[in-house]
């Protein structure tokens, strides 16, 4: 029975037969983060292949080195990917396809939180939205063929989008996703006054670091729902998950800067 005290290792142990021999792609892997924790939970149970990514390739390489030291037979590949850059995502997808003909589980974990000043990528996309959602949207689309079930490989691929309780702060701002001008927002696209109060942030429709982060987490929830409805491809199931609280570098950054 799982409850609020359940750890990742508990779930992995209970479903180890579903891990053995499977290929997992996990984005945003570094020591102290959720990505590394996922790897550590999976590694004891014989995954067929762990493919891990990071913007700074040294970080997932360090995790891979530690895992191999503990599990010498573990097959693990490390790929550089910057989710803010579509070309980097495309290159990473090609590298993944070279080392794995089938992807059973894609964990869209990488993310940023509470960038103090409104920042746009080279494509003009607000940074939280670009990295937390758009980059993962593209990666998922590019790997769809590798994840969909076939007659020879009937197991449905699974997409796991890491969300957050912060999604309650903001719906998706269809009228102004990049915080250019809030005059185009409809009332039901505005931040939640109640949630802003609960999180201890001022209510405003202009750029707010936590509101921008929250919008991106709403987006990944909607993304998972759309995938499960068959929009992307038949034979793929998607989930959005709230991982709960964890002390990690992102949280420490928020405490120091937001």
Swiss-Prot record:
This protein's UniProt keywords: NADP, Oxidoreductase
Q: Does the keyword Transmembrane helix apply?
A: no
User: Among its keywords, does the record have Oxidoreductase?
Assistant: yes
Gene3D superfamilies for this protein? NAD(P)-binding Rossmann-like Domain
Q: Where is the active site?
A: 163
Pathway assignment: Secondary metabolite biosynthesis
Which EC number(s) does the record attach to this protein?
1.1.1.-
- What Pfam family is a match for this entry? adh_short
Positions in coiled-coil regions: none
Q: Which InterPro entries did the record assign?
A: NAD(P)-bd_dom_sf (IPR036291), SDR_fam (IPR002347)
Q: Which GO terms describe its molecular function?
A: oxidoreductase activity
Q: Which residues bind NADP(+)?
A: 34, 59, 82, 109, 141, 193
What biological function has been recorded for the protein in this entry?
A: Oxidoreductase; part of the fragmented gene cluster that mediates the biosynthesis of fusarochromene, a tryptophan-derived metabolite closely related to a group of mycotoxins including fusarochromanone. Within the pathway, fscI catalyzes the formation of the chromene ring from the prenyl moity added by the prenyltransferase fscG. The first step of the pathway is the epimerization of L-tryptophan to D-tryptophan in the presence of the NRPS-like tryptophan epimerase fscC. D-tryptophan is subsequently hydroxylated by the tryptophan 6-hydroxylase fscE to yield 6-hydroxytryptophan.
- What PANTHER family would the database entry show? NAD(P)-BINDING ROSSMANN-FOLD SUPERFAMILY PROTEIN, RETINOL DEHYDROGENASE
Family named by the database record: Belongs to the short-chain dehydrogenases/reductases (SDR) family.
The protein here is known as Oxidoreductase fscI
């Amino acid at each position: 029975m799982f409850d609020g005290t359940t750890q990742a290792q508990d779930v992995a142990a209970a479903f180890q037969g579903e891990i053995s021999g499977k290929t997992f792609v996990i984005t945003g892997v570094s020591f102290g983060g959720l990505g590394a924790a996922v790897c550590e939970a999976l590694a004891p149970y014989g995954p067929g292949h762990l493919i891990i990514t990071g913007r700074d390739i040294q970080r997932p390489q360090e995790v891979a080195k530690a895992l191999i030291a503990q599990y010498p037979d573990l097959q693990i590949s490390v790929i550089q990917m910057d989710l803010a850059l579509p070309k980097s995502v495309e290159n990473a997808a090609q590298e993944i396809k070279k080392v794995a003909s089938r992807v059973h589980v894609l964990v869209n974990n990488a993310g940023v939180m509470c960038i103090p000043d409104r920042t746009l990528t080279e494509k003009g996309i607000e940074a939280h939205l670009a990295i937390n959602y758009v980059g993962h949207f593209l990666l998922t689309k590019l790997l769809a063929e590798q994840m969909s079930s076939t007659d020879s490989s009937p197991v449905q691929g699974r997409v796991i989008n890491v969300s957050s309780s912060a999604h309650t702060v903001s719906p998706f701002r269809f009228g102004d996703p990049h915080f250019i001008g809030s005059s185009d927002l409809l009332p039901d696209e505005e931040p939640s006054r109640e949630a802003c109060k609960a999180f201890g942030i001022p209510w405003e429709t202009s750029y707010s670091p936590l509101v921008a982060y929250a919008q991106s987490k709403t987006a990944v929830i909607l993304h998972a729902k759309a995938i499960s409805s068959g929009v992307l491809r038949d034979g793929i199931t998607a989930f959005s998950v709230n991982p709960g609280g964890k002390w990690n570098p992102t949280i420490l950054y928020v405490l120091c800067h937001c």
